């Protein structure tokens, strides 16, 4: 069986739809100086959003202090999923230390603990919210 290409403009409806879908580009948000576009990530509700890493690396502080710091610069601490993407694609933007996520541990036996990401070994775990860890902030933009 030979595979012959169709002449340009002679496509079936499903092929045209597929080509149109491939041509669609996601409009990327404008970045401020020092910001790094991380990518599109979905939240637990399945909504897609852009994630942008903000400039600045905050020294060791408690979880609540880091949450407040991130908010003060117009951001939030990364989620656990966002941390995995940051580890995989932007590890060079982090010290080889542990960084707070924005997620407290929801297990009642671990009240007062929150999730963190290490950028040395790459593991995730929980630490007491009174512990002092580093932080980076992200901003999220919902994709309409």
Describe the function of each predicted region.
Residues 80-144:
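C-terminal, surface-exposed recognition/capping segments
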Residues 2-75, 116, 120-121, 129, ...:
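Extracellular adhesion/carbohydrate-recognition regions
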């Amino acid at each position: 069986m030979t595979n012959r290409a169709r002449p340009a403009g002679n496509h079936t409806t499903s092929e045209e739809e597929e080509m149109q879908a491939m041509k669609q580009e996601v409009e990327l948000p404008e970045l401020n100086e020092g910001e790094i576009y991380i990518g599109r990530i979905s939240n637990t509700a399945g909504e897609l959003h852009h994630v942008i890493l903000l400039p600045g690396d905050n020294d060791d502080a408690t979880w609540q202090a880091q949450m407040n710091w991130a908010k003060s610069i117009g951001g939030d601490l990364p989620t656990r999923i966002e941390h995995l993407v940051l580890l995989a694609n932007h590890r060079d933007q982090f010290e080889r230390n542990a960084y707070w996520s924005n997620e407290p541990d929801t297990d009642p036996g671990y009240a007062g603990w929150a999730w963190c990401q290490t950028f040395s070994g790459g593991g995730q775990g929980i630490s007491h919210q009174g512990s002092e860890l580093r932080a980076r902030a992200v901003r999220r933009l919902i994709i309409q």
